[in-house]
Protein backbone atom coordinates (compact mmCIF):
# COMPACT_ATOMS: atom_id res chain seq x y z
CA UNK A 1 0.00 0.00 0.00
CA UNK A 2 1.01 3.63 -0.44
CA UNK A 3 0.46 5.37 2.90
CA UNK A 4 1.72 8.69 1.54
CA UNK A 5 -0.94 8.63 -1.21
CA UNK A 6 -3.65 7.64 1.31
CA UNK A 7 -2.72 10.48 3.69
CA UNK A 8 -2.41 12.97 0.79
CA UNK A 9 -5.97 12.20 -0.23
CA UNK A 10 -7.26 12.57 3.35
CA UNK A 11 -5.40 15.86 4.01
CA UNK A 12 -6.46 17.23 0.61
CA UNK A 13 -10.13 16.54 1.43
CA UNK A 14 -9.72 18.29 4.80
CA UNK A 15 -8.01 21.31 3.17
CA UNK A 16 -10.86 21.66 0.66
CA UNK A 17 -13.44 21.36 3.48
CA UNK A 18 -11.54 24.16 5.27
CA UNK A 19 -11.93 26.43 2.22
CA UNK A 20 -8.85 25.62 0.12
CA UNK A 21 -9.11 25.45 -3.70
CA UNK A 22 -9.69 21.99 -5.24
CA UNK A 23 -6.19 21.88 -6.75
CA UNK A 24 -4.40 22.54 -3.44
CA UNK A 25 -1.23 20.55 -2.70
CA UNK A 26 -1.26 18.81 0.72
CA UNK A 27 2.53 18.19 0.47
CA UNK A 28 2.52 15.05 2.63
CA UNK A 29 6.09 13.81 3.21
CA UNK A 30 7.78 11.13 5.27
CA UNK A 31 9.02 12.83 8.45
CA UNK A 32 12.77 13.37 8.71
CA UNK A 33 12.79 12.87 12.51
CA UNK A 34 10.86 10.51 14.79
CA UNK A 35 9.62 13.34 17.02
CA UNK A 36 7.72 14.81 14.04
CA UNK A 37 5.70 11.61 13.60
CA UNK A 38 5.73 9.25 10.64
CA UNK A 39 4.48 11.82 8.12
CA UNK A 40 4.20 15.60 7.89
CA UNK A 41 1.68 17.61 5.87
CA UNK A 42 3.48 20.82 4.85
CA UNK A 43 0.98 22.32 2.40
CA UNK A 44 -0.95 24.46 4.89
CA UNK A 45 1.42 27.47 4.72
CA UNK A 46 1.15 27.87 0.94
CA UNK A 47 -2.65 27.50 1.00
CA UNK A 48 -2.99 29.90 3.98
CA UNK A 49 -1.03 32.53 2.04
CA UNK A 50 -3.43 32.21 -0.92
CA UNK A 51 -6.45 32.47 1.42
CA UNK A 52 -4.98 35.35 3.44
CA UNK A 53 -5.20 33.32 6.67
CA UNK A 54 -2.79 32.64 9.52
CA UNK A 55 -1.27 29.18 8.82
CA UNK A 56 -1.94 27.83 12.32
CA UNK A 57 -5.56 28.97 12.12
CA UNK A 58 -5.98 27.08 8.82
CA UNK A 59 -4.15 24.06 10.28
CA UNK A 60 -6.64 23.95 13.16
CA UNK A 61 -9.55 24.05 10.70
CA UNK A 62 -7.93 21.28 8.64
CA UNK A 63 -7.59 19.14 11.78
CA UNK A 64 -11.28 19.61 12.56
CA UNK A 65 -12.12 18.09 9.13
CA UNK A 66 -9.32 15.50 9.01
CA UNK A 67 -10.59 11.95 9.40
CA UNK A 68 -7.67 9.61 10.09
CA UNK A 69 -9.66 7.21 12.22
CA UNK A 70 -8.00 3.79 12.13
CA UNK A 71 -4.89 5.24 10.42
CA UNK A 72 -3.31 7.62 12.94
CA UNK A 73 -3.50 7.67 16.72
CA UNK A 74 -2.09 11.19 17.10
CA UNK A 75 -2.13 14.31 14.90
CA UNK A 76 -0.61 17.60 16.03
CA UNK A 77 0.19 21.08 14.71
CA UNK A 78 3.86 22.03 14.90
CA UNK A 79 5.72 25.28 14.26
CA UNK A 80 4.05 27.74 11.89
CA UNK A 81 1.49 25.21 10.61
CA UNK A 82 3.03 21.82 9.91
CA UNK A 83 0.76 18.86 10.65
CA UNK A 84 2.55 15.89 12.21
CA UNK A 85 0.89 12.49 11.75
CA UNK A 86 1.68 9.50 13.99
CA UNK A 87 0.47 6.17 12.58
CA UNK A 88 -1.68 3.94 14.76
CA UNK A 89 0.16 0.74 15.88
CA UNK A 90 -2.98 -1.29 15.06
CA UNK A 91 -2.93 0.14 11.51
CA UNK A 92 0.76 -0.80 11.18
CA UNK A 93 0.15 -4.32 12.51
CA UNK A 94 -2.78 -4.91 10.17
CA UNK A 95 -0.80 -3.79 7.11
CA UNK A 96 2.30 -5.82 8.03
CA UNK A 97 0.01 -8.86 8.07
CA UNK A 98 -1.51 -7.90 4.72
CA UNK A 99 1.95 -7.43 3.17
CA UNK A 100 3.02 -10.90 4.31
CA UNK A 101 -0.06 -12.45 2.71
CA UNK A 102 0.87 -10.99 -0.68
CA UNK A 103 3.65 -12.14 -3.02
CA UNK A 104 4.07 -8.47 -3.94
CA UNK A 105 4.37 -7.50 -0.24
CA UNK A 106 1.23 -5.40 -0.54
CA UNK A 107 2.55 -3.26 -3.41
CA UNK A 108 -0.33 -2.16 -5.63
CA UNK A 109 -0.08 -1.79 -9.41
CA UNK A 110 -0.64 1.65 -10.96
CA UNK A 111 -2.36 2.02 -14.32
CA UNK A 112 -0.06 0.20 -16.75
CA UNK A 113 1.80 2.19 -19.38
CA UNK A 114 4.01 1.24 -22.33
CA UNK A 115 7.42 2.61 -21.39
CA UNK A 116 10.46 2.54 -23.69
CA UNK A 117 13.78 2.57 -21.83
CA UNK A 118 16.88 3.42 -23.89
CA UNK A 119 20.04 2.18 -22.18
CA UNK A 120 23.49 0.61 -22.54
CA UNK A 121 24.12 1.49 -26.24
CA UNK A 122 27.59 0.03 -26.92
CA UNK A 123 29.31 0.40 -30.29
CA UNK A 124 29.83 -2.36 -32.83
CA UNK A 125 33.40 -3.63 -33.31
CA UNK A 126 34.47 -2.29 -29.92
CA UNK A 127 34.54 -3.94 -26.52
CA UNK A 128 32.32 -2.50 -23.81
CA UNK A 129 34.26 -0.28 -21.40
CA UNK A 130 33.54 1.35 -18.05
CA UNK A 131 31.82 4.24 -19.84
CA UNK A 132 28.96 1.83 -20.62
CA UNK A 133 28.55 0.63 -17.03
CA UNK A 134 26.38 3.41 -15.60
CA UNK A 135 23.84 3.50 -18.44
CA UNK A 136 23.59 -0.30 -18.41
CA UNK A 137 23.01 -0.86 -14.70
CA UNK A 138 21.02 2.29 -13.87
CA UNK A 139 18.79 1.70 -16.89
CA UNK A 140 18.31 -1.94 -15.92
CA UNK A 141 17.34 -1.03 -12.33
CA UNK A 142 14.72 1.33 -13.79
CA UNK A 143 13.44 -1.43 -16.11
CA UNK A 144 13.17 -3.96 -13.27
CA UNK A 145 11.28 -1.49 -11.07
CA UNK A 146 8.84 -0.47 -13.81
CA UNK A 147 8.17 -4.10 -14.74
CA UNK A 148 7.57 -5.05 -11.11
CA UNK A 149 4.99 -2.25 -10.90
CA UNK A 150 3.18 -3.82 -13.87
CA UNK A 151 4.18 -1.58 -16.78
CA UNK A 152 4.90 -2.94 -20.25
CA UNK A 153 8.58 -2.10 -20.65
CA UNK A 154 10.33 -2.12 -24.03
CA UNK A 155 14.11 -2.27 -23.63
CA UNK A 156 15.84 -0.34 -26.42
CA UNK A 157 19.57 -1.00 -26.79
CA UNK A 158 20.51 1.85 -29.15
CA UNK A 159 23.64 0.17 -30.49
CA UNK A 160 26.07 2.20 -32.62
CA UNK A 161 25.85 -0.10 -35.64
CA UNK A 162 26.02 2.31 -38.58
CA UNK A 163 28.26 4.96 -40.08
CA UNK A 164 31.48 5.56 -42.00
CA UNK A 165 33.50 3.30 -39.69
CA UNK A 166 31.93 0.21 -41.27
CA UNK A 167 33.30 1.01 -44.70
CA UNK A 168 36.69 1.44 -43.08
CA UNK A 169 36.44 -1.85 -41.17
CA UNK A 170 35.22 -3.89 -44.11
CA UNK A 171 37.94 -2.41 -46.36
CA UNK A 172 40.65 -3.30 -43.86
CA UNK A 173 39.32 -6.80 -43.19
CA UNK A 174 39.25 -7.35 -46.92
CA UNK A 175 42.81 -6.03 -47.25
CA UNK A 176 43.92 -8.53 -44.61
CA UNK A 177 41.91 -11.29 -46.32
CA UNK A 178 39.94 -11.70 -43.12
CA UNK A 179 36.47 -11.64 -44.65
CA UNK A 180 35.32 -14.49 -42.43
CA UNK A 181 34.79 -12.11 -39.53
CA UNK A 182 32.54 -14.58 -37.73
CA UNK A 183 35.54 -16.52 -36.44
CA UNK A 184 37.24 -13.51 -34.92
CA UNK A 185 37.21 -12.62 -31.26
CA UNK A 186 36.07 -9.11 -30.45
CA UNK A 187 39.47 -8.31 -28.97
CA UNK A 188 40.91 -8.87 -32.48
CA UNK A 189 38.28 -6.56 -33.93
CA UNK A 190 39.47 -3.82 -31.58
CA UNK A 191 42.96 -4.25 -33.02
CA UNK A 192 41.50 -4.26 -36.53
CA UNK A 193 39.60 -1.07 -35.72
CA UNK A 194 42.81 0.72 -34.67
CA UNK A 195 44.66 -0.49 -37.77
CA UNK A 196 41.74 0.38 -40.04
CA UNK A 197 41.64 3.91 -38.59
CA UNK A 198 45.38 4.26 -39.10
CA UNK A 199 45.07 3.22 -42.76
CA UNK A 200 42.06 5.49 -43.20
CA UNK A 201 44.01 8.48 -41.85
CA UNK A 202 47.26 7.76 -43.72
CA UNK A 203 46.29 6.12 -47.04
CA UNK A 204 44.03 8.23 -49.27
CA UNK A 205 43.33 5.35 -51.70
CA UNK A 206 42.24 3.17 -48.77
CA UNK A 207 40.07 5.99 -47.41
CA UNK A 208 38.44 6.43 -50.81
CA UNK A 209 37.70 2.70 -51.01
CA UNK A 210 36.26 2.77 -47.47
CA UNK A 211 33.98 5.66 -48.40
CA UNK A 212 32.76 3.81 -51.49
CA UNK A 213 32.04 0.76 -49.32
CA UNK A 214 29.88 2.89 -47.04
CA UNK A 215 27.84 3.98 -50.05
CA UNK A 216 27.47 0.35 -51.16
CA UNK A 217 26.51 -0.71 -47.63
CA UNK A 218 23.94 2.07 -47.36
CA UNK A 219 22.68 1.15 -50.83
CA UNK A 220 21.87 -2.37 -49.59
CA UNK A 221 24.60 -4.33 -51.42
CA UNK A 222 24.23 -7.90 -50.13
CA UNK A 223 27.98 -8.67 -49.83
CA UNK A 224 28.60 -5.60 -47.68
CA UNK A 225 25.43 -6.17 -45.64
CA UNK A 226 26.63 -9.71 -44.93
CA UNK A 227 30.02 -8.42 -43.71
CA UNK A 228 28.28 -5.77 -41.60
CA UNK A 229 25.96 -8.36 -40.02
CA UNK A 230 28.96 -10.49 -39.05
CA UNK A 231 30.55 -7.54 -37.27
CA UNK A 232 27.29 -6.81 -35.43
CA UNK A 233 26.79 -10.48 -34.50
CA UNK A 234 30.29 -10.94 -33.09
CA UNK A 235 30.00 -7.74 -31.07
CA UNK A 236 26.58 -8.47 -29.61
CA UNK A 237 27.38 -12.10 -28.76
CA UNK A 238 30.40 -10.85 -26.78
CA UNK A 239 28.33 -8.08 -25.17
CA UNK A 240 25.71 -10.64 -24.14
CA UNK A 241 28.36 -12.43 -22.07
CA UNK A 242 29.00 -9.14 -20.25
CA UNK A 243 25.27 -8.50 -19.75
CA UNK A 244 24.82 -11.98 -18.28
CA UNK A 245 27.79 -11.51 -15.94
CA UNK A 246 26.34 -8.17 -14.82
CA UNK A 247 22.94 -9.80 -14.21
CA UNK A 248 21.15 -7.28 -16.42
CA UNK A 249 18.05 -8.23 -18.37
CA UNK A 250 19.13 -7.13 -21.87
CA UNK A 251 19.13 -9.73 -24.68
CA UNK A 252 19.79 -9.76 -28.43
CA UNK A 253 16.06 -9.15 -28.97
CA UNK A 254 16.42 -5.72 -27.34
CA UNK A 255 18.90 -4.40 -29.92
CA UNK A 256 17.45 -1.40 -31.76
CA UNK A 257 20.55 0.01 -33.41
CA UNK A 258 20.99 3.22 -35.36
CA UNK A 259 20.57 1.22 -38.60
CA UNK A 260 16.91 0.59 -37.72
CA UNK A 261 16.08 4.24 -38.39
CA UNK A 262 18.03 4.65 -41.66
CA UNK A 263 15.02 4.09 -43.96
CA UNK A 264 13.17 6.91 -42.16
CA UNK A 265 15.82 9.62 -42.57
CA UNK A 266 15.15 10.86 -46.15
CA UNK A 267 11.42 11.13 -45.38
CA UNK A 268 12.06 13.05 -42.18
CA UNK A 269 14.32 15.59 -43.90
CA UNK A 270 11.73 16.04 -46.68
CA UNK A 271 8.91 16.40 -44.14
CA UNK A 272 10.78 18.98 -42.04
CA UNK A 273 11.41 20.98 -45.22
CA UNK A 274 7.75 20.72 -46.23
CA UNK A 275 6.69 21.96 -42.78
CA UNK A 276 9.00 24.96 -43.12
CA UNK A 277 11.11 23.84 -40.18
CA UNK A 278 14.22 22.92 -42.20
CA UNK A 279 15.96 25.14 -44.75
CA UNK A 280 19.01 24.98 -47.02
CA UNK A 281 22.04 26.76 -45.55
CA UNK A 282 25.47 26.68 -47.20
CA UNK A 283 24.56 23.44 -48.96
CA UNK A 284 23.39 21.64 -45.80
CA UNK A 285 19.83 21.17 -44.50
CA UNK A 286 19.41 22.98 -41.19
CA UNK A 287 16.71 23.58 -38.57
CA UNK A 288 17.13 26.95 -36.83
CA UNK A 289 15.88 26.91 -33.24
CA UNK A 290 14.86 30.14 -31.49
CA UNK A 291 15.09 28.27 -28.18
CA UNK A 292 18.90 28.01 -28.56
CA UNK A 293 21.18 30.92 -29.42
CA UNK A 294 24.68 30.93 -30.90
CA UNK A 295 27.47 33.25 -29.73
CA UNK A 296 26.05 36.08 -31.81
CA UNK A 297 22.67 35.71 -30.12
CA UNK A 298 21.06 34.35 -33.28
CA UNK A 299 18.91 31.18 -33.46
CA UNK A 300 21.17 28.12 -33.38
CA UNK A 301 21.32 25.99 -36.50
CA UNK A 302 20.98 22.23 -36.07
CA UNK A 303 22.21 20.35 -39.15
CA UNK A 304 20.07 17.36 -40.11
CA UNK A 305 21.69 16.60 -43.49
CA UNK A 306 25.23 17.43 -44.53
CA UNK A 307 26.29 18.96 -47.82
CA UNK A 308 27.39 15.51 -49.06
CA UNK A 309 23.95 14.05 -48.29
CA UNK A 310 25.02 12.30 -45.07
CA UNK A 311 22.82 12.33 -41.98
CA UNK A 312 23.76 13.18 -38.41
CA UNK A 313 23.04 11.75 -34.94
CA UNK A 314 20.35 14.41 -34.50
CA UNK A 315 18.49 13.13 -37.58
CA UNK A 316 18.65 9.59 -36.21
CA UNK A 317 17.43 10.73 -32.78
CA UNK A 318 14.47 12.55 -34.36
CA UNK A 319 13.55 9.37 -36.26
CA UNK A 320 14.10 7.29 -33.13
CA UNK A 321 11.65 9.35 -31.02
CA UNK A 322 9.08 9.27 -33.86
CA UNK A 323 9.43 5.47 -34.19
CA UNK A 324 9.05 4.93 -30.45
CA UNK A 325 5.78 6.84 -30.39
CA UNK A 326 4.25 5.78 -33.72
CA UNK A 327 5.44 2.17 -33.95
CA UNK A 328 6.11 1.12 -30.34
CA UNK A 329 3.12 3.17 -29.03
CA UNK A 330 5.12 4.51 -26.08
CA UNK A 331 3.32 6.41 -23.33
CA UNK A 332 6.68 7.48 -21.92
CA UNK A 333 10.30 7.26 -23.15
CA UNK A 334 13.32 7.25 -20.81
CA UNK A 335 16.87 7.80 -22.06
CA UNK A 336 19.79 6.72 -19.85
CA UNK A 337 22.52 8.70 -21.58
CA UNK A 338 25.34 10.67 -19.97
CA UNK A 339 24.89 14.34 -19.11
CA UNK A 340 27.23 15.56 -21.88
CA UNK A 341 24.55 14.65 -24.46
CA UNK A 342 21.85 16.78 -22.81
CA UNK A 343 21.80 19.74 -25.21
CA UNK A 344 21.98 17.44 -28.23
CA UNK A 345 18.92 15.49 -27.02
CA UNK A 346 16.99 18.63 -26.08
CA UNK A 347 17.54 20.08 -29.56
CA UNK A 348 16.43 16.85 -31.26
CA UNK A 349 13.31 16.70 -29.07
CA UNK A 350 12.49 20.37 -29.70
CA UNK A 351 12.40 19.54 -33.43
CA UNK A 352 10.34 16.39 -32.69
CA UNK A 353 7.72 18.44 -30.81
CA UNK A 354 7.61 21.23 -33.42
CA UNK A 355 7.12 18.69 -36.20
CA UNK A 356 4.30 17.02 -34.25
CA UNK A 357 6.01 13.62 -34.27
CA UNK A 358 5.46 13.05 -30.53
CA UNK A 359 2.67 14.87 -28.63
CA UNK A 360 3.43 16.81 -25.45
CA UNK A 361 1.38 14.25 -23.51
CA UNK A 362 4.15 11.67 -24.06
CA UNK A 363 7.16 12.54 -21.90
CA UNK A 364 10.65 12.22 -23.40
CA UNK A 365 12.91 12.11 -20.34
CA UNK A 366 16.69 12.40 -20.28
CA UNK A 367 17.72 10.51 -17.13
CA UNK A 368 21.27 11.75 -17.35
CA UNK A 369 24.20 10.61 -15.26
CA UNK A 370 27.66 11.86 -14.35
CA UNK A 371 31.07 10.32 -14.93
CA UNK A 372 32.88 7.50 -13.17
CA UNK A 373 36.10 8.91 -11.68
CA UNK A 374 39.27 7.40 -10.25
CA UNK A 375 40.54 8.23 -6.75
CA UNK A 376 42.47 11.14 -8.32
CA UNK A 377 39.17 12.75 -9.32
CA UNK A 378 39.90 12.26 -13.03
CA UNK A 379 38.02 9.96 -15.45
CA UNK A 380 38.59 6.32 -14.46
CA UNK A 381 41.49 4.84 -16.50
CA UNK A 382 43.98 1.96 -16.43
CA UNK A 383 47.38 2.60 -14.82
CA UNK A 384 48.74 3.12 -18.33
CA UNK A 385 46.08 5.78 -18.95
CA UNK A 386 43.91 3.64 -21.25
CA UNK A 387 40.19 2.92 -21.19
CA UNK A 388 39.20 0.20 -18.71
CA UNK A 389 37.43 -2.68 -20.43
CA UNK A 390 34.28 -3.77 -18.65
CA UNK A 391 35.25 -7.45 -18.82
CA UNK A 392 38.58 -6.67 -17.09
CA UNK A 393 36.79 -4.67 -14.39
CA UNK A 394 34.42 -7.57 -13.67
CA UNK A 395 37.35 -10.04 -13.62
CA UNK A 396 39.05 -7.89 -10.99
CA UNK A 397 35.83 -7.59 -8.97
CA UNK A 398 35.56 -11.38 -8.93
CA UNK A 399 39.19 -11.86 -7.93
CA UNK A 400 38.98 -9.33 -5.07
CA UNK A 401 35.66 -10.81 -3.85
CA UNK A 402 37.14 -14.33 -4.01
CA UNK A 403 39.94 -13.33 -1.63
CA UNK A 404 37.53 -11.52 0.67
CA UNK A 405 34.96 -14.32 1.02
CA UNK A 406 37.59 -17.09 1.28
CA UNK A 407 39.14 -15.23 4.21
CA UNK A 408 35.78 -14.95 5.99
CA UNK A 409 34.58 -18.50 5.14
CA UNK A 410 37.52 -20.93 5.44
CA UNK A 411 35.17 -23.94 5.74
CA UNK A 412 32.96 -23.18 2.73
CA UNK A 413 33.03 -25.54 -0.29
CA UNK A 414 34.79 -24.36 -3.47
CA UNK A 415 31.54 -24.19 -5.47
CA UNK A 416 29.75 -22.21 -2.77
CA UNK A 417 32.73 -19.85 -2.44
CA UNK A 418 32.80 -19.24 -6.20
CA UNK A 419 29.08 -18.43 -6.28
CA UNK A 420 29.43 -16.17 -3.23
CA UNK A 421 32.38 -14.36 -4.84
CA UNK A 422 30.30 -13.74 -7.97
CA UNK A 423 27.30 -12.46 -6.01
CA UNK A 424 29.43 -10.20 -3.78
CA UNK A 425 31.88 -8.99 -6.45
CA UNK A 426 29.38 -8.12 -9.18
CA UNK A 427 26.90 -6.83 -6.59
CA UNK A 428 29.58 -4.55 -5.11
CA UNK A 429 30.40 -2.94 -8.47
CA UNK A 430 26.73 -2.38 -9.29
CA UNK A 431 25.61 -1.20 -5.85
CA UNK A 432 28.50 1.28 -5.54
CA UNK A 433 27.16 3.00 -8.64
CA UNK A 434 23.43 2.59 -7.96
CA UNK A 435 23.72 3.95 -4.40
CA UNK A 436 25.00 7.33 -5.69
CA UNK A 437 22.71 9.98 -7.11
CA UNK A 438 23.03 9.31 -10.85
CA UNK A 439 23.22 13.03 -11.70
CA UNK A 440 26.61 13.38 -9.99
CA UNK A 441 30.07 12.07 -10.85
CA UNK A 442 31.23 9.32 -8.49
CA UNK A 443 34.61 8.00 -7.39
CA UNK A 444 35.27 4.32 -8.07
CA UNK A 445 36.96 2.83 -4.98
CA UNK A 446 37.48 -0.93 -4.56
CA UNK A 447 38.03 -0.75 -0.78
CA UNK A 448 34.81 1.17 -0.14
CA UNK A 449 32.60 -0.93 -2.40
CA UNK A 450 33.78 -4.26 -0.94
CA UNK A 451 33.50 -3.13 2.69
CA UNK A 452 31.12 -4.96 5.04
CA UNK A 453 30.22 -1.66 6.73
CA UNK A 454 28.25 1.26 5.34
CA UNK A 455 25.89 1.50 2.39
CA UNK A 456 27.52 -1.24 0.28
CA UNK A 457 26.38 -4.44 -1.43
CA UNK A 458 28.32 -6.74 0.95
CA UNK A 459 26.71 -5.02 3.96
CA UNK A 460 23.21 -5.27 2.46
CA UNK A 461 23.71 -8.89 1.38
CA UNK A 462 25.01 -9.74 4.85
CA UNK A 463 22.07 -7.89 6.48
CA UNK A 464 19.71 -10.14 4.51
CA UNK A 465 21.47 -13.34 5.64
CA UNK A 466 21.48 -12.06 9.22
CA UNK A 467 17.69 -11.75 9.22
CA UNK A 468 17.36 -15.25 7.74
CA UNK A 469 19.66 -16.64 10.43
CA UNK A 470 16.96 -15.85 13.03
CA UNK A 471 14.75 -18.46 11.38
CA UNK A 472 17.61 -20.95 11.04
CA UNK A 473 18.48 -20.62 14.73
CA UNK A 474 14.85 -21.15 15.71
CA UNK A 475 14.35 -23.99 13.24
CA UNK A 476 11.10 -22.33 12.20
CA UNK A 477 9.34 -22.56 8.86
CA UNK A 478 7.83 -19.19 7.94
CA UNK A 479 4.48 -20.87 7.13
CA UNK A 480 4.17 -22.12 10.73
CA UNK A 481 3.35 -18.64 12.05
CA UNK A 482 1.41 -17.26 9.10
CA UNK A 483 -1.81 -16.98 11.13
CA UNK A 484 -0.17 -15.45 14.21
CA UNK A 485 -1.25 -11.84 14.89
CA UNK A 486 1.21 -8.94 14.65
CA UNK A 487 1.24 -6.77 17.76
CA UNK A 488 3.12 -3.45 17.74
CA UNK A 489 3.87 -2.50 21.35
CA UNK A 490 7.43 -1.07 21.32
CA UNK A 491 8.70 2.09 19.60
CA UNK A 492 11.35 0.14 17.65
CA UNK A 493 8.70 -2.28 16.41
CA UNK A 494 6.58 0.66 15.24
CA UNK A 495 9.53 2.38 13.51
CA UNK A 496 10.51 -0.82 11.69
CA UNK A 497 6.90 -1.58 10.69
CA UNK A 498 6.31 1.97 9.39
CA UNK A 499 9.51 1.85 7.30
CA UNK A 500 8.61 -1.58 5.90
CA UNK A 501 5.27 -0.18 4.77
CA UNK A 502 7.05 2.61 2.85
CA UNK A 503 8.41 0.15 0.28
CA UNK A 504 5.76 1.03 -2.31
CA UNK A 505 6.43 4.75 -1.89
CA UNK A 506 10.12 4.10 -2.53
CA UNK A 507 9.38 2.06 -5.66
CA UNK A 508 7.13 4.88 -6.91
CA UNK A 509 9.94 7.44 -6.58
CA UNK A 510 12.40 5.19 -8.44
CA UNK A 511 9.81 4.58 -11.19
CA UNK A 512 9.02 8.28 -11.52
CA UNK A 513 12.51 9.77 -11.23
CA UNK A 514 14.76 6.92 -12.38
CA UNK A 515 16.82 7.27 -9.19
CA UNK A 516 17.83 3.84 -7.84
CA UNK A 517 19.92 5.50 -5.10
CA UNK A 518 16.58 6.21 -3.36
CA UNK A 519 15.96 2.45 -3.12
CA UNK A 520 19.52 1.88 -1.87
CA UNK A 521 19.07 4.52 0.85
CA UNK A 522 15.72 2.98 1.85
CA UNK A 523 17.15 -0.56 2.12
CA UNK A 524 20.18 0.67 4.07
CA UNK A 525 17.89 2.53 6.48
CA UNK A 526 15.71 -0.58 6.80
CA UNK A 527 18.74 -2.74 7.63
CA UNK A 528 19.76 -0.24 10.32
CA UNK A 529 16.26 -0.17 11.83
CA UNK A 530 16.18 -3.97 11.91
CA UNK A 531 19.55 -4.00 13.67
CA UNK A 532 18.20 -1.69 16.40
CA UNK A 533 14.99 -3.71 16.66
CA UNK A 534 16.98 -6.99 16.92
CA UNK A 535 19.17 -5.62 19.74
CA UNK A 536 16.38 -4.08 21.83
CA UNK A 537 13.42 -6.36 21.12
CA UNK A 538 14.37 -10.00 21.83
CA UNK A 539 12.83 -12.29 19.24
CA UNK A 540 13.52 -15.91 20.15
CA UNK A 541 13.70 -15.12 23.89
CA UNK A 542 10.62 -12.86 23.89
CA UNK A 543 8.47 -12.87 27.03
CA UNK A 544 5.53 -14.59 25.31
CA UNK A 545 4.87 -16.77 22.29
CA UNK A 546 2.57 -14.08 20.90
CA UNK A 547 5.36 -11.47 21.06
CA UNK A 548 7.87 -13.95 19.63
CA UNK A 549 5.67 -14.78 16.64
CA UNK A 550 4.81 -11.14 16.06
CA UNK A 551 8.51 -10.19 16.00
CA UNK A 552 9.31 -13.14 13.77
CA UNK A 553 6.75 -11.79 11.30
CA UNK A 554 8.41 -8.36 11.37
CA UNK A 555 11.74 -10.12 10.72
CA UNK A 556 10.20 -12.11 7.88
CA UNK A 557 8.79 -9.01 6.17
CA UNK A 558 12.20 -7.34 6.58
CA UNK A 559 13.92 -10.27 4.83
CA UNK A 560 11.38 -10.33 2.01
CA UNK A 561 11.59 -6.55 1.53
CA UNK A 562 15.40 -6.55 1.47
CA UNK A 563 15.45 -9.37 -1.08
CA UNK A 564 12.79 -7.85 -3.33
CA UNK A 565 14.32 -4.37 -3.06
CA UNK A 566 17.78 -5.69 -4.00
CA UNK A 567 16.20 -7.64 -6.85
CA UNK A 568 14.72 -4.44 -8.33
CA UNK A 569 18.31 -3.14 -8.38
CA UNK A 570 19.61 -6.30 -10.06
CA UNK A 571 21.62 -7.26 -6.95
CA UNK A 572 21.64 -10.97 -6.12
CA UNK A 573 21.45 -12.38 -2.59
CA UNK A 574 22.57 -15.61 -0.91
CA UNK A 575 21.18 -17.29 2.20
CA UNK A 576 24.54 -17.76 3.92
CA UNK A 577 27.68 -15.60 3.99
Curated annotation (Swiss-Prot):
In terms of Gene3D superfamilies, this protein maps to: Arginyl tRNA synthetase N-terminal domain, HUPs, Isoleucyl-tRNA Synthetase, Domain 1
Family annotation (PROSITE patterns):
AA_TRNA_LIGASE_I
Give the matching Pfam families.
Arg_tRNA_synt_N, DALR_1, tRNA-synt_1d
Keywords (alphabetical) are: Aminoacyl-tRNA synthetase, ATP-binding, Cytoplasm, Ligase, Nucleotide-binding, Protein biosynthesis
Gene Ontology cellular-component terms for this entry are: cytoplasm
Q: Could you tell me where this protein is found in the cell?
A: Cytoplasm
Q: Please name the SMART domains in this protein's record.
A: Arg_tRNA_synt_N, DALR_1
Q: Which InterPro entries match?
A: aa-tRNA-synth_I_CS, Arg-tRNA-ligase, Arg-tRNA-synth_N, Arg-tRNA-synth_N_sf, ArgRS_core, DALR_anticod-bd, Rossmann-like_a/b/a_fold, tRNAsynth_Ia_anticodon-bd
EC? Answer: 6.1.1.19
What GO annotations for molecular function exist for this entry?
A: arginine-tRNA ligase activity; ATP binding
* Nucleotide-binding keyword on record: yes
**Gene Ontology biological process terms in this record:** arginyl-tRNA aminoacylation
Q: Which CDD domains match?
A: Anticodon_Ia_Arg, ArgRS_core
- The enzyme class is ligase
- Which reaction does this enzyme catalyse, per its entry? tRNA(Arg) + L-arginine + ATP = L-arginyl-tRNA(Arg) + AMP + diphosphate
Coiled-coil region(s) = none
Motif 'HIGH' region location, chain numbering: 122-132
The signal sequence is none
Q: Which family does it belong to?
A: Belongs to the class-I aminoacyl-tRNA synthetase family.
Assembly, per entry:
Monomer.
Name of the protein:
Arginine--tRNA ligase
| Species assigned in the record | Klebsiella pneumoniae subsp. pneumoniae (strain ATCC 700721 / MGH 78578)
